[in-house]
């Protein structure tokens, strides 16, 4: 069955995840296909993006779709006072799918409630980034051959990082052994996220206490743009640095992921270790997003 909107990681079932992984495998080495020939994808980026916007653009083109859109709110009629609802309605007239990034929590859900075409959430405020979670899980699946039974450690800004929210919610579709949440007390995962999880979670501030148990260390930068108070940001901006000392305490086959961009939270010396998989992770963005586009827009025998 074709997917409709993808606003949250919870919009995907376990079967959806594995079906997308299988498609991503098939799309990994293709140059150009015509599966979406005649379709138009709108990239509605009300908030700046490099990797996400470019990988979605590339994914659409490689499937044969045409791409329209904008890269900032300033280049749209919203700068003239148009409301978001009207912008979404106008994009419905021009395209078959809208990939949307916005600075406000819940913007993608709002858009999905008024849109007649699929909305794919490319990040909304500090809320969610479900396609990044798809890439994260696909990376883990490619490295280990499975996701169930693994121990995760999420480190850094767990309060404002939307990638963290999406990954935690996506893991409810799997069976992680446990998840360590490693952050300063000011940047702990929000209660409404924790309350929806169905697996063991342990909160700590010290990565050295748990690093030996972790299969997947997921590192996030401190989200400066989400802080209202600059003083609070300055207090926590360099809370953690993943360096060789920490990495050398990991399991030999443990991996380090990061949604990027990286600032100072991973020492560049770590890049050369076998544990560092964040650039490999980034390389999987295009086939995963191709697979998602195909699930949302591709022709189906059962349509």
Curated annotation (Swiss-Prot):
Transmembrane segments: none annotated. It is an enzyme of class 2 (transferase). It comes from Saccharolobus islandicus (strain L.S.2.15 / Lassen #1) (Sulfolobus islandicus). It holds the Pfam family OTCace_N. One of its GO terms (molecular function) is amino acid binding. Heterooligomer of catalytic and regulatory chains. Catalyzes the condensation of carbamoyl phosphate and aspartate to form carbamoyl aspartate and inorganic phosphate, the committed step in the de novo pyrimidine nucleotide biosynthesis pathway. Pathway: Pyrimidine metabolism; UMP biosynthesis via de novo pathway; (S)-dihydroorotate from bicarbonate: step 2/3. This is Aspartate carbamoyltransferase catalytic subunit. Its EC number is 2.1.3.2. Carbamoyl phosphate binds at residues 51-52, 101, 129, 132, 260-261. The keyword Plastid does not apply. It comes from the Archaea. L-aspartate binds at residues 80, 162, 221. Keywords: Pyrimidine biosynthesis, Transferase. GO terms for biological process: 'de novo' pyrimidine nucleobase biosynthetic process; 'de novo' UMP biosynthetic process; amino acid metabolic process. It catalyses: carbamoyl phosphate + L-aspartate = N-carbamoyl-L-aspartate + phosphate + H(+). Belongs to the aspartate/ornithine carbamoyltransferase superfamily. ATCase family. NCBIfam families: asp_carb_tr, PRK00856.1.
């Amino acid at each position: 069955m074709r997917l409709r909107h993808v606003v949250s990681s919870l919009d995907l079932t376990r079967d959806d995840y594995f079906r997308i992984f299988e498609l991503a495998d098939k799309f990994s080495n293709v140059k150009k296909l015509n599966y979406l020939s005649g379709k138009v994808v709108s990239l509605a980026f009300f908030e700046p993006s490099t990797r996400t916007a470019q990988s979605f653009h590339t994914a659409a083109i490689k499937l044969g779709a045409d791409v329209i859109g904008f890269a900032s709110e300033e280049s749209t009629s919203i700068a003239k006072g148009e409301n978001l609802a009207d912008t979404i309605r106008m994009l419905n007239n021009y395209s078959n799918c809208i990939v949307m990034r916005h600075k406000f929590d819940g913007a993608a859900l709002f858009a999905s409630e008024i849109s007649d075409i699929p909305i794919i959430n490319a990040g909304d405020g500090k809320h969610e980034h479900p396609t990044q979670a798809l890439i994260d899980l696909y990376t883990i699946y490619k490295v280990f051959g499975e996701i169930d039974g693994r121990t995760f450690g999420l480190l850094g800004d767990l309060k404002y990082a939307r990638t963290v929210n999406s990954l935690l919610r996506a893991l409810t579709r799997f069976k992680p052994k446990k998840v360590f949440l490693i952050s300063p007390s000011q940047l702990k995962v929000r209660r409404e996220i924790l309350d929806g999880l169905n697996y063991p979670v342990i909160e700590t501030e010290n990565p050295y206490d748990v690093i030996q148990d972790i299969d997947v260390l997921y590192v996030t930068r401190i989200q400066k743009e989400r802080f209202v108070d600059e003083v609070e940001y300055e207090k926590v901006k360099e809370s953690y640095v993943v360096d060789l000392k920490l990495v050398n305490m990991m399991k030999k086959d443990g991996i380090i992921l990061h949604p990027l961009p990286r600032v100072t939270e991973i020492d560049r010396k770590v890049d050369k270790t076998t544990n560092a998989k964040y650039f490999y992770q980034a390389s999987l963005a295009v086939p995963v997003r191709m697979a998602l586009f195909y699930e949302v827009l591709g022709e189906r025998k059962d349509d």
